[in-house]
Amino acid sequence: MPRMFGTDGVRGLANRDLTAQLALDLGDAAVRVLGDDERSEFESRRRALVGRDTRVSGDFLAAALSAGMSAGGFDVIDAGIIPTPGVAYLTSVLNVEMGAVISASHNPMPDNGIKFFARGGFKLPDTKEDEIEAVLGQDWDRPTGAGVGRVSHDTATATNLYIDHLVSAIAPVGPDKSQPTPLKGLKIVADCANGATSVVAPEALRRAGADVTVINASPDGYNINKNAGSTHPEQLQAMVKASGAVMGVAFDGDADRCLAVDEDGNMVNGDQIMGILARAKKNAGKLNHDTLVVTVMSNLGLKLALRSMGIKTVQTNVGDRYVLEEMLRGDYSLGGEQSGHVINREFATTGDGTLTALTLCNEVVKSGKSLKELAADFPQLPQTLINVPNVDKMAAKTNAKVQAAVEREEKLLGDTGRVLLRPSGTEPLVRVMAEAETQQQADEVCDRLAKVVADELTL
């Protein structure tokens, strides 16, 4: 049977795949697996924290998840609507034993998901998720009487703690308790995707001094990600040009990612954002080992540009959890994905879109350059991606003819391009990607390779 937990928790159609009963059972199982014995003498009660995005199904799922946790003896802090990285931060700063987020990120509104954070605010490794799945729905000696947990609701306190943390990343409060405003006069547009950062991002940017025009920050339970945010940036691009803003930032539904738009409405992707921030950290002496952690999907153009700046790259599989694992293993300080997940370990344990927006805006101000100028230092090689369906995806790395074709194309491209075959994690298809000096060459290489994959691996 396939694992219940995917690359980012448990996801599915709310009230069909992800039911109230399943949420209850997940809460019940999580307290058994994630409850630890590291409590200090002052921690008489076990505690968990739950947050969610703006989907209408989040209400009943949060209630069910919290019920499972409290029935297992945990006092639950319901932080209400708050970005995923906010839950990670609060799990750490409040020193609770675990955190949980109810969100399906950039997925359509009818979907939802549940993912957990361990003490310290880190996503769970596969082994812990498997332990939760193994005890799911099992009976056990649950507490009674005073051993049963309570559920408290405190959205305002949780949100304010998180906003304070975000702003302090670029504007630490001075000894006189005054709040610096490093973004003063910076005119920007923020697209909140009608999601979890609809309150947090505008407030954090304004407190840092920015002149912010906010769009898609009126969630109604049904409009999350709908023609908005990082997956649909067209409205943001138009607003930046129409308003005369110097840049724009776009978040997804749970605000763990951020993409940007320059003053001409051109997209600035996660690779370019990482490049800008990596160079800034290196110049400040804060880029550990002069290395940026990226995934296999990061554009070769980023790696070539960074190499010319004396910055190395380490590559992982797709998924911000794998980026973080490598960052922890190698003691690296910055990493992320082309999709806009950026992990800044100085301030966060997971991708944080609002933090990325603040630090990117800060670098624009400090550099004295426009975002367009900064992004131009990290040109992207033309890229073509073809999905080849209905194939034996597991044979992509072992089929002799496919591997011979890969070697031919790699030899043809040399150091000026690359190819990548990536089996889908959920479907019987292989993603064929090619990067080259020209779009025509990328198209031709990708077409040839996709044909070989189809001819050799079709089921």
From Swiss-Prot:
<keyword id="KW-0413">Isomerase</keyword>
<dbReference type="GO" id="GO:0005975">
    <property type="term" value="P:carbohydrate metabolic process"/>
</dbReference>
<dbReference type="InterPro" id="IPR016055">
    <property type="entry name" value="A-D-PHexomutase_a/b/a-I/II/III"/>
</dbReference>
<dbReference type="GO" id="GO:0000287">
    <property type="term" value="F:magnesium ion binding"/>
</dbReference>
<dbReference type="GO" id="GO:0009252">
    <property type="term" value="P:peptidoglycan biosynthetic process"/>
</dbReference>
<feature type="binding site">
    <location>
        <position position="252"/>
    </location>
    <ligand>
        <name>Mg(2+)</name>
    </ligand>
</feature>
<dbReference type="InterPro" id="IPR005841">
    <property type="entry name" value="Alpha-D-phosphohexomutase_SF"/>
</dbReference>
<dbReference type="InterPro" id="IPR036900">
    <property type="entry name" value="A-D-PHexomutase_C_sf"/>
</dbReference>
<dbReference type="Pfam" id="PF02878">
    <property type="entry name" value="PGM_PMM_I"/>
</dbReference>
<dbReference type="Pfam" id="PF02879">
    <property type="entry name" value="PGM_PMM_II"/>
</dbReference>
<protein>
    <recommendedName>
        <fullName>Phosphoglucosamine mutase</fullName>
        <ecNumber>5.4.2.10</ecNumber>
    </recommendedName>
</protein>
<dbReference type="InterPro" id="IPR050060">
    <property type="entry name" value="Phosphoglucosamine_mutase"/>
</dbReference>
<dbReference type="GO" id="GO:0004615">
    <property type="term" value="F:phosphomannomutase activity"/>
</dbReference>
<dbReference type="GO" id="GO:0008966">
    <property type="term" value="F:phosphoglucosamine mutase activity"/>
</dbReference>
<feature type="modified residue" description="Phosphoserine">
    <location>
        <position position="105"/>
    </location>
</feature>
<dbReference type="InterPro" id="IPR005844">
    <property type="entry name" value="A-D-PHexomutase_a/b/a-I"/>
</dbReference>
<dbReference type="GO" id="GO:0006048">
    <property type="term" value="P:UDP-N-acetylglucosamine biosynthetic process"/>
</dbReference>
<feature type="active site" description="Phosphoserine intermediate">
    <location>
        <position position="105"/>
    </location>
</feature>
<dbReference type="GO" id="GO:0005829">
    <property type="term" value="C:cytosol"/>
</dbReference>
<dbReference type="InterPro" id="IPR005843">
    <property type="entry name" value="A-D-PHexomutase_C"/>
</dbReference>
<comment type="similarity">
    <text>Belongs to the phosphohexose mutase family.</text>
</comment>
<dbReference type="InterPro" id="IPR006352">
    <property type="entry name" value="GlmM_bact"/>
</dbReference>
<feature type="binding site">
    <location>
        <position position="256"/>
    </location>
    <ligand>
        <name>Mg(2+)</name>
    </ligand>
</feature>
<dbReference type="Pfam" id="PF00408">
    <property type="entry name" value="PGM_PMM_IV"/>
</dbReference>
<comment type="function">
    <text>Catalyzes the conversion of glucosamine-6-phosphate to glucosamine-1-phosphate.</text>
</comment>
<keyword id="KW-0597">Phosphoprotein</keyword>
<dbReference type="InterPro" id="IPR005845">
    <property type="entry name" value="A-D-PHexomutase_a/b/a-II"/>
</dbReference>
<keyword id="KW-0460">Magnesium</keyword>
<dbReference type="Pfam" id="PF02880">
    <property type="entry name" value="PGM_PMM_III"/>
</dbReference>
<feature type="binding site" description="via phosphate group">
    <location>
        <position position="105"/>
    </location>
    <ligand>
        <name>Mg(2+)</name>
    </ligand>
</feature>
<dbReference type="InterPro" id="IPR005846">
    <property type="entry name" value="A-D-PHexomutase_a/b/a-III"/>
</dbReference>
<feature type="binding site">
    <location>
        <position position="254"/>
    </location>
    <ligand>
        <name>Mg(2+)</name>
    </ligand>
</feature>
<keyword id="KW-0479">Metal-binding</keyword>
